[in-house]
Amino acid sequence: MSVDADKQKKYRQIMERVVIPESVRRANSPEEIERRLRKPLAPGQVWTVVDDDEFCHVVIQSVHEDPRIVTVVPMSLDLESETPDSLVLMTGGIEGLPSIAWPDLAKDIPTRVLCKPLGMIDKQRFALIANNMPGENFSVYRGRELDEFGFLPEMKRERIDDFLYDCSMQCNLLTTLPSISDRRDGQKIQVRICRFLMEQCGMSRSDAEAASERPTQLNKETLEKLLTSGFEVDDLKKAELLPESLLCEIELPIVKETVEAYAQENPQNADPYVSLAQEAYGLAARHAKSHFGDWAAEIRKVRIQHHT
């Protein structure tokens, strides 16, 4: 048996004897996770970052003005992975458990790779992590320099650093976020388009409101009427910008799969709610005031349509 296989076997044997505290069970309940997801991002929150088949734990160091990006500090529950540049939290770490943090490895990553919220680190310990300082009063210590065999256990550290580096490179692929003024202008243009479609094209209010959210998807004849009546192409594009209240909270995988499945099954369907949901996922942004309800309501419409 290889060394790694032997370690895994011992780990499984240990975990089989571990009794998970009731507080941890409650913290991982679907209801508690949903409650956390409804909160806006904030420094001190602990999350699981997932991208492709890899994952790691992080604590949010700061939230950017562009809500699609956050700065995070990597963490680990593996106490054997401590290094000289790490901090060891003997209490109050990930879900209150002993944990390692690497403040020097802080990176900007896309909000969308934050997958599962794991609660908060208290203010005192978070301040120590943010300032990369040990604090014996809070059981936060500097990582040891050598392991029992005289080697630096850096493999885990390097693996996490490489993973977060790959995540951080995705920030360069984000498109420029529409300004608040442009989004507000877009909402005003939507109202004008809606009024035009009702008065000049005989649409019902509900149809006109839906069409005004995606005017470029109107049929050729109606589109020409819009353009000849004084609307510019740029106006139509502005009308399709998401309003502030619909910047999405987070990419919920199960909902994303539903939307993608609906789009694949209905490739010719220009349903504005499908487009809206897809654009929301593309932005993967959290608004500071957390309009989760508005966004979730639009997604629910897509799900209802998909299942009926």
Residue ranges and their predicted role:
Residues 1-15, 31, 92-196, 202, ...:
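C-terminal terminal-subdomain/extension
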Residues 1-35, 40, 238-240:
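Compositionally biased, charged N-terminal/linker segments
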Residues 43-44, 103:
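Loop/turn positions that initiate beta-strands
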Residues 48-92:
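Compact nucleic-acid interaction/catalytic patches
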Residues 57-59, 208, 236:
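Alpha-helix N-cap/helix-start motif at helix boundaries, enriched for small hydrophobics
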Residues 198-229, 239-244:
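Recognition helix of helix-turn-helix/homeodomain-like DNA-binding domains
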Residues 212, 227-300:
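Short amphipathic recognition helices of helix-turn-helix/homeodomain-type DNA-binding modules
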Residues 301-306:
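Mid-protein regulatory/catalytic core that forms ligand/cofactor-binding pockets
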